[in-house]
Amino acid sequence: DVAAKTGFVNIHLLVSPEDPEHISEIKRILKRLQFHALSDRFDCTREELIKLGKLTDTSIVDDVAALRHGATQFKVNFDQLRKVIHESDWAKKNILIAVAGNAGDGTSGVRQAADATLRQEIEKFAHIVFSSSPAQREFWLGQRSGLTPEDLRIRYGGCKPCLHGSDSHDQKSVGQPVDKRFSWIKGALEFDALRQACIDPEGRAYVGEMPPRSALPSQVISHVKISDADWAC
C-alpha cells in the first residue's frame, strides 16, 4: 500500500515449485493477508477477491471479471506482508521477494523525504530488483561512486540482482523487453538458479540482448607465480 509515481509499489512473490504442495502452501500464506475496506475485512483468497470486486463495481456479475477487478482493489500493507513472510519457515525457504525498481510502480517512484526510510525498508526486504536499467544494476552491485558493496550490506542487506520485470500488460510485449534487455541467469532451468543469483548477483545475473561471452574479471586468473619448482621452467 505504498504509493509510487503513478500507482502503488509492486512487490512480487516468486514461489519455488520444488515442493509438491507449493500451491496449497502459498494459498495458506496469501490467506493471512487482509484488506480492510467498505466496513469489512477481505482475505486474499479467490472467494474474497470476487466479493470485493462485485462490491466495488456493482455492474460486474461474472466471477472472473470480479476476481480481476477485486485483485486490483486489494492493497497489501507492507508491514503485514513482511510479518507474514517472517513468521513462516516455509515462506522463507521457498519464496523470493522481488520489488519493481522503476518510478511508475516501483521504489524509484517513492520520492518524498518522509518516505525515504520506508523505501529503504522495502528494498532491504527484497531479494531481487525488477529493473533492466544499467544504472540500477550498477547501484545494486555497489559499482556506483560513493556506494560500495559493504554499504549495500549495511543499508539493504547486501547486493541484489537486477532482472527485467515479469509483468506483461499486453500480449505483444511478452518476450519483447524494451531495448532487448533480456534477463540471463547462470545455472540450470530451476528455481535454485535464482537463489544462487541472489547470493552472487554480479556473477550469475545479467540483463542485455545476449549473455556475457567471456568470463567475468573476478573469475579470470591474471597471473600465476610458482616458487621452488624447476620443473615448471
Give, region by region, the residue ranges found by the protein language model.
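Charged catalytic cores and adjacent phosphate/nucleic-acid-binding surfaces used
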Residues: 1-32, 102-233
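Active-site gating loops and adjacent loop-to-helix segments of metal-dependent hydrolytic enzymes
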Residues: 10-64
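Generic secondary-structure transition motif, activating predominantly at the C-termini of alpha-helices
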Residues: 34-37, 53, 68, 89, ...
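Hydrophobic, aromatic-enriched interface-forming segments
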Residues: 49-115
